[in-house]
A protein has these predicted regions:
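Bacterial N-terminal signal peptides
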Residues: 12-21
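Short, well-ordered beta-strand segments enriched in hydrophobic/aromatic residues
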Residues: 116-123, 227-233
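Sequence context of c-type cytochrome heme-c attachment sites
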Residues: 28-68, 82-107
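The canonical Cys-X-X-Cys-His
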Residues: 68-78, 162
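Bacterial N-terminal signal peptides that target proteins for export
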Residues: 3-12
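Short helix-loop boundary/capping segments
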Residues: 177-220
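Beta-strand-rich interaction surfaces with strong enrichment in secreted/lumenal proteins
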Residues: 106-109, 216-222
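Acidic/polar low-complexity flexible segments
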Residues: 27-58, 136, 142-191, 237-282
């Protein structure tokens, strides 16, 4: 009888291992050497929240946004940004002090299967932050995906969450975080501190650093001077086959925090449809 129990137990264990194995197989990362790359520039945006973007006296591009143009449609030229970086770094738009490097490239790759979306980001994080106060994390990398209810989400990317009255903005409330007036973003973040957990959150009427339902997993690290960060999350919520989802990337480099990040403009990620970043079906 004892032998019988042992056999039953080992079969049960074997079954559990098989089930676990198949879960892992479902989340098998793609062969990144076969996945197309799209490089975007991330930049220090200073004090240019959505209110600034939509104020004609500050930003002549407001007219284009109102006509339905995207920020990137106007500002990305031959893979670079046509901004006046001197103005962005000036006291007018960065009253505290700008980082030494105003922009740098991030290469994005995306793939998906029935269950999951996989996103890989590679970049060299610059030193020279103005205010390196995050002692635990040399680098943090976040991505946000907008749902269909975010006004102008496919034009402005993450700017719909970026407001002049949020923390680290001049004269703003230190407790007030990113928020949207309507709609929601799914948020995921990698932190470089040893043992830091993946952030699976959202931005609604405030920023929530947990409570997301995307089952976000992330692996990140540095080889030489290049960071590679790979997110795995459920193909769910705003992400679905047949959809092009607005997204943005933010990198806090050199222990930066708050608004002292380098951000991308809004791009789209397409799952089975055309987009700025086309996700490769596995």
């Amino acid at each position: 009888e004892c032998e019988m129990k042992k056999t039953t137990f080992s079969l049960a264990l074997f079954g559990a291992l098989l089930a676990f194995g198949s879960q892992l197989a479902q989340a098998a990362a793609p062969d990144w050497s076969k996945v197309p790359k799209r490089t975007v520039q991330v930049f220090h945006a200073g004090v240019t929240p959505v209110e600034w973007v939509m104020k004609k006296s500050e930003h002549s591009g407001r007219t284009g946004v109102n006509k339905g143009e995207s920020c990137v449609g106007c500002h990305e030229e031959k893979g670079n940004l046509n901004f006046d970086m001197k103005r962005l770094a000036s006291k007018e738009l960065e009253p505290k002090g700008a980082p030494k490097t105003m922009s740098f490239p991030v290469t994005i790759q995306s793939a998906y299967d029935k269950e999951n979306a996989y996103v890989r980001l590679t970049f060299k994080a610059p030193a020279g932050a103005f205010d390196p106060v995050d002692k635990e994390n040399e680098v943090k990398v976040a991505m946000m995906f907008a749902n269909a209810d975010v006004p102008k989400g496919d034009q402005v990317g993450c700017w719909a969450t970026c407001h002049g009255d949020a923390r680290t903005m001049p004269g703003a409330d230190d407790k007030k975080t990113k928020y949207t007036k309507s709609g929601a973003y799914e948020l995921m973040q990698w932190k470089s501190a040893a043992g830091a957990k993946a952030v699976d959150g959202s931005v609604t009427d405030k920023r929530n650093m947990e409570g997301g339902t995307a089952n976000v997993q992330v692996e990140g690290g540095k080889s030489g001077d290049t960071y590679t960060v790979t997110f795995t999350r459920k193909l769910s919520g705003a992400l679905a086959e047949g959809k092009a989802v607005p997204f943005g990337v933010a990198v806090h480099a050199d222990h930066a925090t708050g608004r002292f990040h380098h951000v991308s403009m809004g791009y789209t990620m397409g799952f089975g449809v055309d987009a700025d970043v086309k996700s490769a079906k596995q």
